[in-house]
């Protein structure tokens, strides 16, 4: 810390002030907010198709075996990416991989939106797996790197729980929207 002296009643008070905790730079807080939003958003996007699988069953003939295969494709994408992205994050930087993670999340959602057969659903889920693998490694590290000083605990909490929050938010949002649009169609 930095020692700063103040005069009070003729006595010199010296106390330590940690410069990183005294005031978080505006840029740092903004970076933390953006990284947190990106992290939670990627996992929210990965949860979007889950409540819609029953809709896909009727619309494109998705079977229970296909749904099981989507889980395997997702896990394969996550695991493969986790093996490769740690060193890639160190070499290329966290921000480019965070951007790639968000772009892949959007691509996965677009593929689900346009899915005309079960194969597209499987590919979309694999893309989401890669997106989440990048988020687990590079984006969570970006969150922690951005969380300095008094925000360090928040950054660690986001890195530890942000994925669960995103999955919950994405599932609830799509489930709610599906319910509302079905009720609206009935009216």
Segments the model singles out, each with a brief description of its role:
Residues 72-85:
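Central cavity-lining transmembrane alpha-helices of secondary-active solute carriers
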Residues 28-52:
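Pair of pore-lining "gating" transmembrane helices in MFS-fold secondary transporters
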Residues 120-124:
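Short hydrophobic/alpha-helical segments at membrane-entry points of transmembrane helices
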